[in-house]
Amino acid sequence: MAAQGWSMLLLAVLNLGIFVRPCDTQELRCLCIQEHSEFIPLKLIKNIMVIFETIYCNRKEVIAVPKNGSMICLDPDAPWVKATVGPITNRFLPEDLKQKEFPPAMKLLYSVEHEKPLYLSFGRPENKRIFPFPIRETSRHFADLAHNSDRNFLRDSSEVSLTGSDA
């Protein structure tokens, strides 16, 4: 009889676990801890950095670098941030970031001052020969790509291997 009481108690405790939902924790590997959603005039911003979701940080981050050099994390869901960053990412990144041939770890640095991208980096974690984080071999400086307006450079640069062979 006592064994039946313990088994019922154990069953009740295990059933309570069904209703427990893990709380959203702050990802410590994300760059932004606190996000700013109030409007910042573009004439005060020097660069905008867009960092897409990675295995280390499960959210998109938008970082504005004002002309004084500090960094301000912007709320990517704020309407003015979407209106500012949307055309930039649509112009310089692939249409569908969820496709398998495009890597999930991407970072874009855009110069508001000069109205051009400065840096794009990404990696492909599913390919063991390529690092899943930005390094020199998987990064492209847009100075090299200024003459190329075709979007296919993203596919070409994402397939840079560490061994130097594409096999």
UniProtKB/Swiss-Prot annotation:
- Primary location: secreted
UniProt GO BP: chemotaxis; hemopoiesis; immune response; inflammatory response; neutrophil chemotaxis
Care to name a GO molecular-function term for this sequence? chemokine activity
Q: Where does the UniProt annotation place the signal sequence?
A: 1-25
Domain of life of the native organism:
Eukaryota
Q: In which family does this protein belong, per the annotation?
A: Belongs to the intercrine alpha (chemokine CxC) family.
Q: What is this protein called?
A: C-X-C motif chemokine 15
Provenance organism:
Mus musculus
Query: What gene is this protein a product of?
Result: Cxcl15
